[in-house]
Amino acid sequence: MGMSKSIKVIVSLALILFLALAATKVEATRYISYRGMNHGDHAIHCDKAHPNTCKKQVANPYRRGCGTIERCRRDTGRK
């Protein structure tokens, strides 16, 4: 029930070809182009004629965290 020798050779060559193509060097640039920098963190349809569409999105809004009165971190209530 084993594979014939010619099928093993074909499968092995196909595997080697696949691995050789997968290991090729990717063409990458060292610097960001001006085209990429023009978009920035504005909305997709940002236009100088319509400044309402150019509002930046808040990524991480400020939260003060846990206060003493909430007793959620180090304060266990024991004295």
UniProtKB/Swiss-Prot annotation:
Keyword Disulfide bond: yes
Any one GO CC term of the record: apoplast
Pfam family, any one: RALF
Residues annotated as signal peptide: 1-28
Recorded superkingdom: Eukaryota
Subcellular location(s) per record: Secreted
Keywords: Disulfide bond, Hormone, Secreted, Signal
Principal localisation: secreted
GO biological process: calcium-mediated signaling; cell-cell signaling; regulation of growth
Disulfide bonds: C46-C54, C66-C72
One GO MF term attached to the UniProt entry: hormone activity
InterPro entries reported in the protein's UniProt record: RALF (IPR008801)
Function summary: Cell signaling peptide that may regulate plant stress, growth, and development. Mediates a rapid alkalinization of extracellular space by mediating a transient increase in the cytoplasmic Ca(2+) concentration leading to a calcium-dependent signaling events through a cell surface receptor and a concomitant activation of some intracellular mitogen-activated protein kinases.
Matches recorded under PANTHER family: PROTEIN RALF-LIKE 15-RELATED
Entry's family note: Belongs to the plant rapid alkalinization factor (RALF) family.
Name this polypeptide is given: Protein RALF-like 15
Protein source organism: Arabidopsis thaliana (Mouse-ear cress)
